[in-house]
């Protein structure tokens, strides 16, 4: 089955057909780096990291670009409040961003372009729009002529006339029409600026992504993605800029993930329910956070609540336990039976079910349901009188491959503490005294599976980490 993507542009699922066979060009709007990212910011990072992983699983060569907005009103304000230089602030929070998303199991993009590295490209792009009549200069600012672009509103499914009703010109703005938006902003006293044909200033927010996407992926890209809140005006304005400049379709598929609520309320600083990833990942296993985020389809809203996160933690533990039990059986069983086509077919069927779920607009919720079923089947198999090496290995491989698509690690076991090892060894001594050799061997095998090497001597049992 081909991959089906819900395209925000058409508001329906479409079969994914890449611009270039076997390749995917994908752009995801990244953060404005003036603070740590909150859990709402983390959802698109996790979602589109998973989308990228699934494309790679299906054999596609993916070029994945995600930007940093490293100059912006919020950044300038934060730098002034903290008494830092803008570049110092942004460097600090870019480093913090990578720490957070790496903890969440996300891979780095192939390119993480920064606005400040593309000023010449941005200025040149704006000049072309002016030459084509799509933009105009006004007292040091440059604005986009929204009404000149015939397709404006096609992504957010709004008409220009409807948008006009709520639009207004703010004090100090020097634009011809309330719908026009800034491509270049004249510098205010004391602000960071770059030289341009229109005077000192810096770019508007929307122009940045149009330029960086074009520079790193070309005039037309396969997939442009981001949070639902970016649909309008940000992505709508990107389309207007890019298609006016390039005379080509900007992006063929638009993907938008849903919002995150906290205990059924919108997350906001005023409500005091603003959760930073940097804080929450110290309280909750980041893998549990990722598993939780993927337990709901990406287009649906998700409610972050303690009981739901705890349920996700218990669910992930069920799958990990099944995986580790299979792995333990493989390393400890001396006599293994002949392989069974019946069980191998059951595993293959689950893998096919997983692909069917992910092919259907990256339905990770259904994909996780498949992992639960795989764990259930594995537990049933482990109760068989004879188990087969081939089947056990196939279970392990399938857990690991499907887990990797979701960015979930099943193999990672917490290292036993010295005190836990000593307690198990004491229990083993008692078992041997009571001639409970089965329990003694079970403890030995469990420790060996965790890389603990035992040496029985006349003075007692010594141990070391392998």
Curated annotation (Swiss-Prot):
A motif ('HIGH' region) lies at residues 31-41. A motif ('KMSKS' region) lies at residues 266-270. Its cofactor is Zn(2+). GO terms for biological process: cysteinyl-tRNA aminoacylation. It catalyses: tRNA(Cys) + L-cysteine + ATP = L-cysteinyl-tRNA(Cys) + AMP + diphosphate. InterPro entries: Cys-tRNA-ligase (IPR015803), Cys-tRNA-synt_Ia_DALR (IPR015273), Cys-tRNA/MSH_ligase (IPR024909), CysS_C (IPR056411), Rossmann-like_a/b/a_fold (IPR014729), tRNA-synt_1_cat_dom (IPR032678), tRNAsynth_Ia_anticodon-bd (IPR009080). Zn(2+) binds at residues 29, 209, 234, 238. GO terms for molecular function: ATP binding; cysteine-tRNA ligase activity; zinc ion binding. Monomer. Belongs to the class-I aminoacyl-tRNA synthetase family. This is Cysteine--tRNA ligase. It comes from Lysinibacillus sphaericus (strain C3-41).
């Amino acid at each position: 089955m081909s991959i089906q993507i819900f395209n925000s542009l058409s508001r329906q699922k479409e079969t994914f057909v890449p611009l270039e066979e076997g390749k995917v060009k994908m752009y995801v709007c990244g953060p404005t780096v003036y603070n740590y990212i909150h859990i709402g910011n983390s959802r698109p990072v996790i979602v589109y990291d998973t989308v990228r992983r699934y494309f790679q699983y299906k054999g596609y060569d993916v070029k994945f670009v995600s930007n940093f907005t490293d100059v912006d009103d919020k950044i300038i304000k934060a730098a002034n409040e903290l008494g830092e230089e803008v570049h110092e602030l942004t460097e600090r929070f870019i480093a913090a961003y990578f720490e957070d998303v790496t903890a969440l199991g996300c891979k780095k993009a192939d390119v993480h372009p920064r606005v400040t590295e593309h000023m010449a490209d941005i200025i040149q792009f704006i000049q072309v729009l002016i030459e084509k009549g799509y933009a105009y200069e006004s007292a040091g600012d440059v604005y986009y002529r929204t009404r000149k672009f015939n397709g404006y509103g096609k992504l957010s499914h709004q008409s220009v006339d409807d948008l006009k009703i709520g639009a207004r010109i703010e004090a100090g703005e020097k634009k011809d029409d309330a719908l026009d938006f800034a491509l270049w902003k004249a510098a205010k006293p004391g602000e960071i600026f770059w030289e341009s044909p229109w005077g000192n200033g810096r770019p508007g927010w929307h122009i940045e992504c149009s330029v960086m996407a074009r520079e790193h992926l070309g005039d037309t890209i396969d997939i442009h993605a981001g949070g639902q809140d970016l649909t309008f005006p940000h992505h709508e304005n990107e389309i207007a800029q890019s298609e006016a400049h390039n005379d080509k379709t900007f992006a063929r598929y638009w993907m938008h993930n849903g919002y995150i609520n906290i205990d059924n309320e919108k997350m906001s600083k005023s409500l005091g329910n603003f959760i930073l990833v940097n804080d929450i990942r110290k309280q909750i296993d980041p893998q549990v956070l990722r598993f939780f985020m993927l337990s709901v389809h990406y287009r649906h809203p998700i409610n972050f609540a303690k009981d739901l996160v705890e349920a996700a933690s218990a669910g992930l533990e069920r799958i990990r336990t099944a995986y580790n039990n299979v792995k333990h059986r493989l390393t400890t069983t001396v006599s293994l039976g002949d392989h069974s086509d019946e069980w191998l077919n059951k595993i293959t069927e689950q893998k096919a079910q997983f692909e069917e779920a992910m092919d259907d607009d990256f339905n990770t919720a259904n994909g996780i349901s498949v992992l639960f079923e795989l764990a259930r089947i594995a537990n049933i198999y482990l109760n068989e009188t004879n188990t087969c090496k081939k089947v056990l290995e196939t279970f392990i491989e399938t857990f690991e491959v499907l887990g990797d698509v979701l960015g979930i690690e099943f193999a990672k076991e917490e290292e036993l503490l010295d005190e836990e090892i000593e307690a198990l060894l004491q229990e083993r001594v008692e078992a041997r005294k009571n001639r409970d050799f089965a329990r003694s061997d079970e403890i030995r095998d469990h420790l060996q599976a965790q890389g603990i090497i035992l040496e029985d001597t006349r003075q007692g049992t010594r141990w070391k980490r392998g």
